[in-house]
């Protein structure tokens, strides 16, 4: 698998700015990752499936129309 910042449907990082402990681990596991943590202010996942969308500065479309 791969690791990285999981991207939501808009291509944005999953924020953990105001979330509780364990939020990112749960979010990452929902995306079939093995684990995750809050790399403040965004979630970071380990063991993501290769098909998972991760945030990439080169292909960043967050906030763009």
Swiss-Prot record:
Domain of life of the source: Eukaryota
- Main localization of the protein described in the UniProt heading: secreted
Keyword list, A-Z: Amidation, Disulfide bond, Ion channel impairing toxin, Neurotoxin, Secreted, Toxin, Voltage-gated sodium channel impairing toxin
The reply to whether Hydrolase figures as a keyword in the UniProt entry is: no
Tissue specificity, in the record's words, reads: Expressed by the venom gland.
Which GO molecular function annotation, any one, does this entry have?
Answer: toxin activity
List each copy of the LCN-type CS-alpha/beta domain by range: 2-63
Q: Which InterPro entries match?
A: LCN-type_CS_alpha_beta_dom, Scorpion_toxin-like, Scorpion_toxin-like_sf, Scorpion_toxinL, Scorpion_toxinL/defensin
Query: Pfam families annotated for this entry?
Result: Toxin_3
List the PROSITE patterns: LCN_CSAB
| Annotated S-S bridges | 12-62, 16-38, 24-43, 28-45
Q: Which GO terms describe its cellular component?
A: extracellular region
Q: Which GO terms describe its biological process?
A: defense response
Subcellular location field: Secreted
Modification sites for Cysteine amide: 62
Which function does this protein serve? Alpha toxins bind voltage-independently at site-3 of sodium channels (Nav) and inhibit the inactivation of the activated channels, thereby blocking neuronal transmission. This toxin is toxic to frogs but non-toxic to insect larvae (T.molitor), mammals (rats) and crustaceans (crabs) at the doses assayed.
Domain text: Has the structural arrangement of an alpha-helix connected to antiparallel beta-sheets by disulfide bonds (CS-alpha/beta).
Family from the record: Belongs to the long (4 C-C) scorpion toxin superfamily. Sodium channel inhibitor family. Alpha subfamily.
Q: What is this protein called?
A: Beta-toxin Tf4a
From what organism does this protein derive?
Tityus fasciolatus
């Amino acid at each position: 698998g791969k690791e990285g910042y999981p991207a939501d449907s808009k291509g944005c990082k999953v924020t953990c700015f105001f979330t509780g402990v364990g939020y990112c681990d749960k979010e990452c596991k929902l995306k079939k990752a093995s684990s995750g943590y809050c790399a403040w202010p965004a979630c970071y996942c380990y063991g993501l499936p290769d098909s998972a969308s991760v945030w990439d500065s080169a292909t960043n479309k967050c906030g763009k129309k």
